[in-house]
Amino acid sequence: DPFVQLGTLDVPMVNVPNEKQADWVLVGNDKKYRIQSQWDYSRPVDIYLMNVKDGSQKLLAENVCIGGFSFSPDGQYAVVYDKVAQDWFLYTVATGEKVNLTENMDVEFVDDEHDTPSLASANGSAVWFEDSKSFLIRDKFDFWQFDPLKPGTPKMFTDGYGRKNDTQLSVTQIIEDPDKAPMNPMMRMFGGAMELKKNETIYFTTYNRTTKQNGLAMKDKGKAPVKKIVEGPYTFGDFKYSKPGKGKKGIFVYARGNFEEGNNLFASYDNFKTQKQMSDINPQQRDYNWGTVELVNWQTADDIFCEGLLFKPEDFDPNKKYPVMIYFYEKNANTLYRHRNPSPSRSTVNIPYFVSNGYVVFVPDVYF
């Protein structure tokens, strides 16, 4: 069979379903909107279905500002977030039929904390189950499950766990063999799309908006209520899990760190009752006056609740006076438990450098 060119200068966006034998791919053409993109940051595109056998195209939607996208694994459906409508839409590939999934729901799916002069995106991407019979979409806190054959009957998938605990959930995939992770490389551009199995445990990374703590939660076999596995004053990442052998317990391996501790490798052999440090990535830090960080909040004269980060030298003495450096740019309170490396910067304030040299650094969130 002859080769068929899918992507061109006019059609730079090509998204291929995980089903490699699919007859159609989704392509985005922004050619007629490129001039206006010089002043219009929304960057709309026309969406086409392209036949992989002959390169023919079928218009699916015009002038769409995409803020989230996911193809079903079998290539029969596409789920698109329209930033203008602030809703998710389901497209049926074979017919081009379009259904608004979220217009009649009582929760919002737009990022309501978006504060730049541009259209807001969704709260993450749609995540499909590998059989293409359902998919998940997140509101601000929780995930809803949709059936493409019954798109008007969404079901709460995470039991309201996120909203009840002021915690934002994000689906994450923890597997034994990374080579077996079903991932469409093109979809990584849209938030790391993945495929879920209905009869396997589904994991969620968690972020508590009140305490700023991070963690991990699970929904066993996709049916049981969401259960917190671990949460703490750290940033967690790169979770791996070794399934238990006969008579043994499973092992979690992951990275953990915060401002005061480097990002080290940890392991838990007892489902996070204890955590064992496996590496010492930055021993030289102990030779320096490092620092501490705390979350502060206050109310403005116009009744806006504000947050900020206060960094102090490790040897801080409350009875002494210190020079203060204020870094005033966007929002940073959500990075309370992020590790920061000392390094030169051409524009920002390197916080470890200043606190190590006897400064107090205050980083207030900016509200527009």
Report each predicted region and the residues it spans.
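Beta-propeller folds
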Residues: 1-252, 257-263, 267, 341
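Serine-hydrolase catalytic core recognition
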Residues: 223, 237-368
